[in-house]
Amino acid sequence: MLYLHGIGHFHPENVITNRFLEELEIGTDEAWILERVGIRERRTVLPLDYIRQTKNRDLRASYEASLYRNAETAAFAARMALDRAGLQPSDIGLVIAGSSSPAFLTPAEAAMAAAELGIDAPCFDVNSACTTFGMQVDLLNRMMADKLPPFVLIVQPENVTRMIDYSDRSSAVLFGDGSTAAVLSASVKARAAFVESECGTNPSGFDKVAIPTGGYFRQDGNAVQGFAIRRMTESIRSLLSAFGKGNDGRFRFIGHQANMGALLT
Protein backbone atom coordinates (compact mmCIF):
# COMPACT_ATOMS: atom_id res chain seq x y z
CA MET A 1 0.00 0.00 0.00
CA LEU A 2 1.35 3.41 -1.01
CA TYR A 3 -0.34 6.48 0.49
CA LEU A 4 -0.83 9.68 -1.50
CA HIS A 5 -0.36 12.78 0.66
CA GLY A 6 -0.35 15.49 -1.97
CA ILE A 7 -0.26 16.02 -5.71
CA GLY A 8 0.79 19.09 -7.68
CA HIS A 9 1.15 20.41 -11.19
CA PHE A 10 2.58 23.30 -13.17
CA HIS A 11 2.12 24.44 -16.74
CA PRO A 12 3.80 27.46 -18.37
CA GLU A 13 1.85 30.56 -19.34
CA ASN A 14 2.37 30.53 -23.11
CA VAL A 15 -0.51 28.90 -25.01
CA ILE A 16 -0.23 27.29 -28.45
CA THR A 17 -3.73 27.46 -29.91
CA ASN A 18 -4.92 25.69 -33.02
CA ARG A 19 -5.18 29.10 -34.66
CA PHE A 20 -1.49 29.70 -33.89
CA LEU A 21 -0.56 26.40 -35.58
CA GLU A 22 -2.74 27.28 -38.55
CA GLU A 23 -0.83 30.56 -38.93
CA LEU A 24 2.45 28.62 -39.15
CA GLU A 25 1.25 27.44 -42.59
CA ILE A 26 2.22 23.80 -42.10
CA GLY A 27 -0.83 22.36 -43.82
CA THR A 28 -3.20 22.20 -40.89
CA ASP A 29 -6.21 24.08 -39.54
CA GLU A 30 -8.38 23.99 -36.44
CA ALA A 31 -11.03 21.75 -37.98
CA TRP A 32 -8.39 19.19 -39.02
CA ILE A 33 -6.77 19.22 -35.57
CA LEU A 34 -10.06 18.84 -33.71
CA GLU A 35 -11.17 16.03 -36.00
CA ARG A 36 -7.89 14.10 -35.86
CA VAL A 37 -6.70 14.59 -32.26
CA GLY A 38 -9.33 16.64 -30.40
CA ILE A 39 -6.85 19.06 -28.82
CA ARG A 40 -7.82 22.75 -28.54
CA GLU A 41 -4.68 24.19 -26.97
CA ARG A 42 -1.39 23.22 -25.37
CA ARG A 43 1.20 25.03 -23.20
CA THR A 44 4.87 25.65 -23.98
CA VAL A 45 8.03 26.77 -22.20
CA LEU A 46 9.13 28.36 -25.48
CA PRO A 47 8.40 31.96 -26.50
CA LEU A 48 5.68 31.98 -29.16
CA ASP A 49 7.72 34.35 -31.33
CA TYR A 50 10.59 31.85 -31.27
CA ILE A 51 8.31 29.10 -32.61
CA ARG A 52 6.74 31.46 -35.13
CA GLN A 53 10.06 32.70 -36.48
CA THR A 54 12.13 29.49 -36.42
CA LYS A 55 9.67 26.55 -36.24
CA ASN A 56 12.31 25.21 -33.82
CA ARG A 57 14.84 24.36 -36.53
CA ASP A 58 17.75 24.33 -34.06
CA LEU A 59 17.19 22.07 -31.05
CA ARG A 60 20.12 23.52 -29.16
CA ALA A 61 18.68 27.00 -29.57
CA SER A 62 15.38 25.81 -28.11
CA TYR A 63 17.03 25.15 -24.74
CA GLU A 64 18.62 28.60 -24.79
CA ALA A 65 15.28 30.20 -25.68
CA SER A 66 13.31 28.24 -23.07
CA LEU A 67 11.62 30.38 -20.42
CA TYR A 68 11.93 27.65 -17.78
CA ARG A 69 14.39 24.91 -16.89
CA ASN A 70 13.12 21.42 -16.07
CA ALA A 71 14.28 21.85 -12.48
CA GLU A 72 12.16 24.99 -12.17
CA THR A 73 8.96 23.47 -13.55
CA ALA A 74 9.49 20.37 -11.41
CA ALA A 75 9.95 22.56 -8.33
CA PHE A 76 6.75 24.52 -9.01
CA ALA A 77 4.76 21.28 -9.16
CA ALA A 78 6.56 19.86 -6.12
CA ARG A 79 5.85 22.92 -3.98
CA MET A 80 2.13 22.55 -4.70
CA ALA A 81 2.27 18.86 -3.75
CA LEU A 82 4.20 19.62 -0.55
CA ASP A 83 1.81 22.41 0.40
CA ARG A 84 -1.20 20.15 -0.10
CA ALA A 85 0.52 17.47 1.99
CA GLY A 86 1.27 19.97 4.76
CA LEU A 87 4.99 19.21 4.50
CA GLN A 88 8.28 21.04 3.98
CA PRO A 89 11.10 20.13 1.56
CA SER A 90 13.14 19.04 4.59
CA ASP A 91 10.57 16.28 5.26
CA ILE A 92 11.44 14.50 1.99
CA GLY A 93 13.81 11.54 2.28
CA LEU A 94 13.96 10.44 -1.37
CA VAL A 95 13.39 12.15 -4.73
CA ILE A 96 12.59 10.26 -7.94
CA ALA A 97 12.20 12.11 -11.24
CA GLY A 98 11.71 11.23 -14.88
CA SER A 99 11.47 13.16 -18.12
CA SER A 100 11.33 12.50 -21.85
CA SER A 101 12.89 15.93 -22.38
CA PRO A 102 15.93 16.10 -20.09
CA ALA A 103 18.31 19.00 -20.44
CA PHE A 104 21.22 16.72 -19.45
CA LEU A 105 22.01 13.04 -19.78
CA THR A 106 23.68 13.44 -16.40
CA PRO A 107 23.19 14.56 -13.65
CA ALA A 108 19.80 13.11 -12.80
CA GLU A 109 16.73 15.30 -13.20
CA ALA A 110 15.88 14.33 -9.62
CA ALA A 111 19.11 15.85 -8.30
CA MET A 112 18.52 19.14 -10.11
CA ALA A 113 14.92 19.33 -8.90
CA ALA A 114 16.03 18.56 -5.34
CA ALA A 115 18.68 21.29 -5.50
CA GLU A 116 16.04 23.76 -6.70
CA LEU A 117 13.89 22.84 -3.70
CA GLY A 118 16.73 22.76 -1.18
CA ILE A 119 16.24 19.04 -0.50
CA ASP A 120 19.24 17.05 0.76
CA ALA A 121 18.28 13.42 0.10
CA PRO A 122 19.04 10.50 -2.23
CA CYS A 123 17.92 11.18 -5.81
CA PHE A 124 17.58 9.07 -8.94
CA ASP A 125 15.59 8.99 -12.17
CA VAL A 126 13.01 6.52 -13.45
CA ASN A 127 11.88 7.47 -16.94
CA SER A 128 9.29 5.56 -18.95
CA ALA A 129 8.01 8.25 -21.33
CA CYS A 130 4.21 8.59 -21.08
CA THR A 131 4.01 6.08 -18.22
CA THR A 132 6.69 7.63 -16.01
CA PHE A 133 4.33 8.55 -13.14
CA GLY A 134 2.80 5.08 -13.12
CA MET A 135 6.16 3.34 -13.28
CA GLN A 136 7.52 5.41 -10.39
CA VAL A 137 4.48 4.52 -8.28
CA ASP A 138 4.74 0.85 -9.24
CA LEU A 139 8.43 0.75 -8.34
CA LEU A 140 7.81 2.27 -4.90
CA ASN A 141 4.86 -0.04 -4.35
CA ARG A 142 7.16 -3.03 -4.84
CA MET A 143 9.88 -1.80 -2.48
CA MET A 144 10.12 -2.86 1.16
CA ALA A 145 8.15 -0.32 3.18
CA ASP A 146 10.57 -0.40 6.12
CA LYS A 147 13.45 0.51 3.80
CA LEU A 148 11.77 3.67 2.50
CA PRO A 149 11.89 7.07 4.24
CA PRO A 150 8.60 8.39 5.67
CA PHE A 151 8.00 10.66 2.66
CA VAL A 152 9.06 10.32 -0.99
CA LEU A 153 8.71 12.99 -3.68
CA ILE A 154 8.20 11.94 -7.31
CA VAL A 155 8.34 14.56 -10.08
CA GLN A 156 7.80 14.46 -13.84
CA PRO A 157 8.97 17.62 -15.66
CA GLU A 158 7.86 17.19 -19.28
CA ASN A 159 8.81 20.09 -21.54
CA VAL A 160 8.68 18.28 -24.86
CA THR A 161 7.89 21.26 -27.11
CA ARG A 162 11.64 21.93 -27.20
CA MET A 163 11.95 18.68 -29.18
CA ILE A 164 9.14 19.27 -31.67
CA ASP A 165 9.64 20.12 -35.34
CA TYR A 166 7.06 22.84 -35.91
CA SER A 167 7.20 22.36 -39.66
CA ASP A 168 5.74 18.86 -39.18
CA ARG A 169 2.00 19.05 -38.57
CA SER A 170 1.73 15.45 -37.37
CA SER A 171 3.79 16.19 -34.25
CA ALA A 172 3.30 19.95 -33.87
CA VAL A 173 -0.40 19.52 -33.03
CA LEU A 174 0.14 16.97 -30.26
CA PHE A 175 2.41 18.20 -27.53
CA GLY A 176 2.31 20.72 -24.73
CA ASP A 177 4.48 21.17 -21.66
CA GLY A 178 3.62 20.49 -18.04
CA SER A 179 5.06 19.09 -14.84
CA THR A 180 3.52 16.94 -12.12
CA ALA A 181 4.59 15.87 -8.66
CA ALA A 182 3.32 13.74 -5.80
CA VAL A 183 4.27 13.15 -2.17
CA LEU A 184 3.98 9.47 -1.24
CA SER A 185 4.51 7.32 1.82
CA ALA A 186 4.56 3.60 2.51
CA SER A 187 4.30 4.10 6.28
CA VAL A 188 2.35 7.31 7.01
CA LYS A 189 -1.33 6.85 6.24
CA ALA A 190 -3.42 9.29 4.19
CA ARG A 191 -6.97 9.50 2.86
CA ALA A 192 -5.91 8.28 -0.61
CA ALA A 193 -3.74 5.31 -1.48
CA PHE A 194 -2.52 3.19 -4.38
CA VAL A 195 -3.95 -0.22 -3.59
CA GLU A 196 -2.71 -2.16 -6.60
CA SER A 197 -0.48 -1.53 -9.58
CA GLU A 198 0.85 -3.46 -12.53
CA CYS A 199 3.19 -2.60 -15.37
CA GLY A 200 3.85 -3.94 -18.83
CA THR A 201 5.97 -3.21 -21.89
CA ASN A 202 6.04 -4.27 -25.52
CA PRO A 203 9.81 -4.33 -26.17
CA SER A 204 9.43 -5.28 -29.85
CA GLY A 205 7.69 -1.96 -30.51
CA PHE A 206 10.53 0.15 -29.14
CA ASP A 207 11.00 1.96 -32.46
CA LYS A 208 7.35 3.00 -32.91
CA VAL A 209 7.70 6.19 -30.87
CA ALA A 210 11.01 7.86 -30.07
CA ILE A 211 12.97 11.01 -29.38
CA PRO A 212 16.50 10.18 -30.59
CA THR A 213 19.46 11.89 -28.95
CA GLY A 214 19.82 15.29 -30.58
CA GLY A 215 16.70 14.72 -32.70
CA TYR A 216 13.01 15.46 -32.92
CA PHE A 217 10.05 13.46 -31.66
CA ARG A 218 8.82 10.87 -34.16
CA GLN A 219 6.25 8.09 -34.12
CA ASP A 220 4.33 5.58 -36.18
CA GLY A 221 1.00 7.13 -35.24
CA ASN A 222 -1.32 4.39 -36.47
CA ALA A 223 0.67 1.60 -34.82
CA VAL A 224 0.99 3.49 -31.53
CA GLN A 225 -2.69 4.40 -31.34
CA GLY A 226 -3.84 0.89 -32.18
CA PHE A 227 -1.57 -0.58 -29.52
CA ALA A 228 -2.64 2.00 -26.92
CA ILE A 229 -6.36 1.43 -27.50
CA ARG A 230 -5.97 -2.35 -27.32
CA ARG A 231 -3.87 -2.37 -24.15
CA MET A 232 -5.94 0.30 -22.38
CA THR A 233 -9.09 -1.69 -23.08
CA GLU A 234 -7.50 -4.86 -21.71
CA SER A 235 -6.36 -3.01 -18.59
CA ILE A 236 -9.78 -1.47 -17.95
CA ARG A 237 -11.46 -4.86 -18.22
CA SER A 238 -8.92 -6.36 -15.84
CA LEU A 239 -9.45 -3.55 -13.32
CA LEU A 240 -13.22 -3.80 -13.56
CA SER A 241 -13.03 -7.52 -12.95
CA ALA A 242 -10.81 -7.05 -9.91
CA PHE A 243 -12.24 -3.89 -8.35
CA GLY A 244 -15.46 -2.91 -10.12
CA LYS A 245 -17.86 -5.16 -8.22
CA GLY A 246 -19.26 -3.97 -4.92
CA ASN A 247 -17.85 -0.49 -5.48
CA ASP A 248 -21.25 1.28 -5.60
CA GLY A 249 -20.58 2.45 -9.14
CA ARG A 250 -17.69 4.65 -8.04
CA PHE A 251 -15.21 3.22 -10.53
CA ARG A 252 -13.56 6.00 -12.56
CA PHE A 253 -11.08 5.75 -15.42
CA ILE A 254 -8.43 8.40 -16.11
CA GLY A 255 -6.64 7.64 -19.35
CA HIS A 256 -3.58 8.93 -21.14
CA GLN A 257 -4.71 12.11 -22.88
CA ALA A 258 -2.56 12.11 -25.99
CA ASN A 259 -5.51 11.78 -28.35
CA MET A 260 -9.25 12.33 -27.87
CA GLY A 261 -10.02 9.78 -30.59
CA ALA A 262 -8.22 7.05 -28.67
CA LEU A 263 -10.14 7.82 -25.47
CA LEU A 264 -13.49 7.84 -27.28
CA THR A 265 -12.68 4.55 -28.99
Regions picked out by a protein language model, each given a short descriptive name:
Residues 51, 77-93, 234-251:
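Phosphate/pyrophosphate-binding loops at sites that engage ATP/ADP/AMP, CoA/4′-phosphopantetheine
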